[in-house]
Amino acid sequence: MDRNHAARNSAPLPLSAAHILLPSPSLSSPAPSPQLRSLSCTTSAAATPVPVPHHCLRCCDPPPPPPPPTPSPSISLLPFPFSDGPRLALNPVIPDDHFSSEMDTTTGGALRCRNQHLFLLQPAGQNAGTGPAQKLKTDETRCYERRGGSQ
């Protein structure tokens, strides 16, 4: 009788279907396989929320927008009253209404007047802050002169 009792206690117990399908709460869950990781990365936002590992968030999120381009400090784009659109100005200190009707880019940013006299502008960044700023004024012929020491 003792031998039958011991045999019944040592025999494995039959497992029901519930024991086979449900994992034991004491066991730790295994790491997800690579297939599950790739599926969780490709799930759409409209689908049911799926827990996604942290490393998958980088492939799921859209890339951040590129930063806006920073303008160059030595060249500025000023509005010009010309028919062919805006042009680059080498000296951003001078207001746009002081420029002549044509810019000659072959002379390093010089302004060309209607009587073909050239007046060079001081490029930005060279000798900045040393002496009075060079300003241009207009006369009746729409030609521009550089102001000297006397105004």
From Swiss-Prot:
Compositional bias of kind Basic and acidic residues: 136-151
Record key words, sorted: Transposable element
Highest taxon, organism lineage: Eukaryota
Spans annotated as Disordered: 123-151
The name this protein goes by in its record: Uncharacterized 16 kDa protein in middle repetitive insertion sequence WIS1
Organism for this UniProt entry: Triticum aestivum (Wheat)
